[in-house]
Amino acid sequence: MISVTELRNGTKVEMDGGLWECLDYSHLKMGRGGAKVVTKFRNMETGSIVDRTFNSGEKLQDIYVEGKKMQYLYKDGADFMFMDMDTFEQVILPPSLVGDAAKFMKENTEVEVAMYGEKALTITLPNQVILKIVETDPGVRGDTVSGGTKPAKLETGAVVQVPLFVEQDTNVKVDTRTGQYLSRA
């Protein structure tokens, strides 16, 4: 159990029957009344965000979330198959858990999966991945004062904006957090 005054950004707790991550907190001291802690939490299972206010003496149950290195193997229908890099055990994760990360995952991509007990909570991709462009229009140099861009479809199906000089079948480095082109690889 931790006191609400010990909450920090990224602290993970169990409350209201769910697993929550603290996104923001502030400690407010009223003139005559007791201090209050105003927080913002994100549900780690559904992604919903709530604001909560606690009195300074309240306690919450903290949880330990373990990060496991896993490797994406393949897509099986709608589900995604991962392998634990330590035990070589295979785990099936639903598309609701993988979310937008699927746009930048190709086979054999190593990811970090946040686990609470035996339950997977979130997937974290590497900050940058190298993917191949499978479809893009030829770059037409026209009236562009500064560098123009064009859409390019990657091998995973994601579409990113790339500079005009980038051609089809080129490997590019993409930022997985923003989905933006970084450079040729």
Curated annotation (Swiss-Prot):
One of its GO terms (biological process) is peptide biosynthetic process. InterPro entries: Elong-fact-P_C (IPR015365), NA-bd_OB-fold (IPR012340), Rib_uL2_dom2 (IPR014722), Transl_elong_fac_P/YeiP (IPR020599), Transl_elong_KOW-like (IPR013185), Transl_elong_P/YeiP_cen (IPR001059), Transl_elong_P/YeiP_CS (IPR013852), Transl_elongation_fac_P (IPR011768). Pathway: Protein biosynthesis; polypeptide chain elongation. Keywords: Cytoplasm, Elongation factor, Protein biosynthesis. The keyword Cytoplasm applies. Belongs to the elongation factor P family. Involved in peptide bond synthesis. Stimulates efficient translation and peptide-bond synthesis on native or reconstituted 70S ribosomes in vitro. Probably functions indirectly by altering the affinity of the ribosome for aminoacyl-tRNA, thus increasing their reactivity as acceptors for peptidyl transferase. This is Elongation factor P.
